[in-house]
Amino acid sequence: EQIARGRHIANSFCASCHSTTNELPLTGGLDLGKDFPMPLGTFVSANLTPAGPLKDWSDGEIFRAIRNGIDRDGNVLFAMAGARGRNLSDADIEAVIAYLRSQPAVVNDTPLPLDQYGPLALILVGAGMIPEPEPPTDAAIAMPAKGATAEFGAYILSYQDCVLCHGADLTGGEPGQLAPVGPSLAVVRGWTMEQFITTLRTGVDPSGHALNNQLMPWQNIGRMDDDELAATYAYLTGLPSLVAQQPK
């Protein structure tokens, strides 16, 4: 059951970065730097199968990388430090680790170091113009009871990377942010729950607009089960910042 839970999270979350096909296995090789609005360097996702570097890491070191974006040598992992996976519950991170250990080893050599900062990135870091990662934490995180509730939806939104594109309050991203600028999610309040789930399962919204998976990873998010998607809908439709906006 733990491995199955970890596989589910890997398939609906981790694979959007750690796979060039958006699918399992998590062989890495995707240059996340190509999605940035400016040339900051190359930031290649690691091969997370037992053929990759994690075979030499302890479970605790993998846990720290997910929770705090720090590798076994104490170096900051640029993409992981800014990602939301740090908000996965302790039990869910342990489930992901159990799944990672269970994967078949698939060879996919990736460049080392994975993070290679370009000149512009070094200038921006030196000038304090790239946001600092959140400070490391060892605080425990518990997952609320699973169900089609806004509370469980809040947990899902805490670790899915929606805010990176759609803004801290999900009312729309800001020009100049590192992630693609996403629109306000107030539009969801004009959809039924069935339309919301269908959009994330098919990549086509109720107006017939096709979502670009490179900008909006609906293929991965749509692999969440019905309760998870219903919980996400319940959370979004009741979020005060979105209630204050009219659906467009």
Q: What kind of feature is each model-predicted range?
A:
Residues 55, 109-125, 143-158, 205-206, ...:
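Hydrophobic transmembrane alpha-helix bundles
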Residues 7, 22-61, 77-89, 117-127, ...:
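Gly/Gly-Pro-rich "capping" loops immediately C-terminal to redox-active cysteine motifs
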Residues 16-26, 98-123, 152:
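Acidic (E/D-rich), amphipathic helical modules within compact regulatory domains
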Residues 6, 13-21, 62, 96, ...:
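The canonical Cys-X-X-Cys-His
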Residues 11-42, 68-75, 103-107, 158-181, ...:
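Periplasmic/extracellular electron-transfer cofactor-ligation site
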Residues 1-10, 25, 122, 126-158:
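Electrostatic cytochrome c docking/interface patches
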Residues 136-152, 170-174, 184, 228-229, ...:
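Short flexible/disordered coil segments
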Residues 58-71, 84-110, 194-197, 201-205, ...:
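C-terminal capping alpha-helices of c-type cytochrome domains
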